[in-house]
């Protein structure tokens, strides 16, 4: 059963809030970054990737974020526009802040890492005054991402967006997206992530991310079921806990659980899997699919993206996912 109810007759299906950055993916693989000489530039940031994936699948998508007043900022907004994402609520930073950069290292399909530059970044300067209630109430769903909670004023902007969403019956998806380098401490992270999760209808994260959120609770022993049930006393209707190559499990408030598998593919790199999973999973739910079917879409989308060099550029269309699912081996 799909427990989500989306308001009809709204111009946007999904509005995402948060990080807009640039990925620089290594062109030379099977070697460390010290030996990498060239990189290819892509738009990045988890909420950006999810929005791009959703738009490519056909959802009417908008974005609330902030970009730097330079070539990188213009590259980001131009790319979003090219992918039919509304950018009316992406102001330009005027303080001299820069675009966050993510350099990727692909030593092997199993050994990938990311080097992040996140000092003085424009996306964390999003101010609450730049969050429009009228814009949010025009959407069926809102996606928030944990990285945007790391610092003020972006933190307050996200919580204001959450309040507007709750006020206007906008379904809230929370992608945990934990990046430790942006935060001062795990305690700070846990506090704000928990506050955001309490206001969310769907929470999506890895087992490790949920473990981080539970560190202040002094659980003697936690597991996926314990984690999910904790959130059902708040707004959550669906909690998805991802286990990498072992697939994912979705729990619902009515006590059901659904296990999602993966599709075999030739893996190039591991990053991008979570964002592509989320975009297709959200799309499936918004199309009225049952949770297991939406999870299959997410798993197929993730397998496609990890076989490609980019994240945002590799986000598949609905036809590409369908064609892939017809031929790829599914492991449940």
Swiss-Prot record:
| Protein's UniProt keywords contain Nucleotide-binding | yes
Provide the protein name: 5-dehydro-2-deoxygluconokinase
E.C. numbers: 2.7.1.92
What reaction does this catalyse? 5-dehydro-2-deoxy-D-gluconate + ATP = 6-phospho-5-dehydro-2-deoxy-D-gluconate + ADP + H(+)
The record's top EC class is transferase
Q: Which GO terms describe its biological process?
A: inositol catabolic process
- Out of the domains of life, which is the source? Bacteria
InterPro entries, per database record: Carboh/pur_kinase_PfkB_CS, DKG_kinase_firmi, Myo_inos_IolC, Myo_inos_IolC-like_sf, PfkB_Carbo_kinase, PfkB_dom, Ribokinase-like
Query: Which family does the record assign?
Result: Belongs to the carbohydrate kinase PfkB family.
Give the organism, scientific name. Bacillus anthracis
Q: Name one Pfam family in it.
A: PfkB
Where does this protein act, in terms of pathway?
Polyol metabolism; myo-inositol degradation into acetyl-CoA; acetyl-CoA from myo-inositol: step 5/7
**GO molecular function: any one?**
5-dehydro-2-deoxygluconokinase activity
Q: Which UniProt keywords apply?
A: ATP-binding, Kinase, Nucleotide-binding, Transferase
Tell me yes or no: is Hydrolase among this UniProt entry's keywords: no
